[in-house]
Amino acid sequence: MARFGTVLFQILAPLQLTLVAFLAALKAASAVAQEKDRGTLILLLMTRMSNTELVLGKLLASLLDVAVMLWVALPIFALVVLFGGVSLEAVMRVFAVTFATMLVAGSWGSTIALRNEKTFQTLAWTAMGIVLWAALSEAIALGLVAGQVPSAAIVGLAISPASAILAAARPSLETTGSFAILGNGVAWYLLATLSVAIGLNLIAILRIRVWNPARESRAAPAADVSPRAGEPVEAAPASAEEHITAAAKSGRTVWHNPILWREVMTRAYGRKMILIRLAYLLIFALTLAGLYATISSGDAFAHRSARDASLPAAARPLAPFFLISLVIVNALAVTSITTERDSKAIDLLLVTDLSPKEFLFGKLGGVCWVTKEMILLPIVLCCVLWASGGVTLENLVYLIGSLFVMDLFAAMLGIHCGMHYANSRTAIGVSLGTVFFLFLGVATCIVMMISFAGSFESQ
């Protein structure tokens, strides 16, 4: 029973950390993005509220639900102590690491939301930032960046949430000595994350009135060209008429489905989409490097015993990349509807001659086109794994088919939640939360089945 409690605790602790980190970041980001979409953030800036009250107030209010969920989970983790193999000190360490990660993830999401104008850009940058943080810090902890040196492992433990949560959940953690607190890697992680959270909030406090309103919203006041009382009304100059005529002739041909045309042919999601694609390509390169290292070392083809069974080595770099791809597809789908509603544009679309089929399939096709990299690049990684002999051709077909189904499900789920929930924050939370819970829930179930492969009773 002690081994069962230890393994169960080491599975639940990273799961809770992952959920809390992503939920905190996305809730904080969506809370600020909703204020921007509705135009109420500018009204808040015009009040007597200070920058500190505005930034910290929005952050703490958005993290309240996540903190309550974390508090409710504490008694459940305490029950694991009854199985043996886990101490209350380990539970406290795990919750301290999780709470610090929640603060830094929420601060990152809030700062990014205050910086960006479009909701999709905010959610994409938030999710990719969390993944990059986890991937790069874990690479440093494993010695893949700075080499196998002792200092790299110490620095990696201080900045890597995965290494910190595993160190906190480890039963044997030395705490002796006069400098035990400073020498503890978990303590260094807490110090580093709290410092980063304070730094992010300071940047947001100092720059909130510089970033907001954005340049796109700062329209120059129009000149007063109305005639005064008693003055004759003169005709418009010929140059103005020629300009109007030229502007009228320079229109573009709209497709039969105007919704699809707008999604594909215009910059409907802002001018910074190229930066999001570049960041995603960076994550793809890191994932490809991790997969190549796994294949080169032979870990991707290693067969372990039932007692030492764990998640396959090739799945470790691929699973986070697949998750972030689904999250971006889902985020674009739900924000494509919520942005239309918050800007009151959907009311105008409802009075046109557009059919529901044109609107739905136009949005769905636009989401698939804009996120084509997030749909195709995971398939490329699967093909690389097949070419190296990691999977058979039959399994490759199943992988590609499953990815297409999951991408379509994520896109349709986002559109459904955006249309079903009137509140944008609720729609975004339900949509992204469903993707996270389904993906991580199934992955955790698989890990538990593999970890307890030697005991049917434990499974």
PLM features: what roles do these ranges have?
Residues 1-23, 30, 65, 69-72, ...:
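Transmembrane alpha-helical segments and their membrane-interface loop/helix boundaries
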Residues 31-63, 259-264, 268-269, 337-369:
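Helix-loop-helix units of permease transmembrane domains in multi-pass membrane transporters
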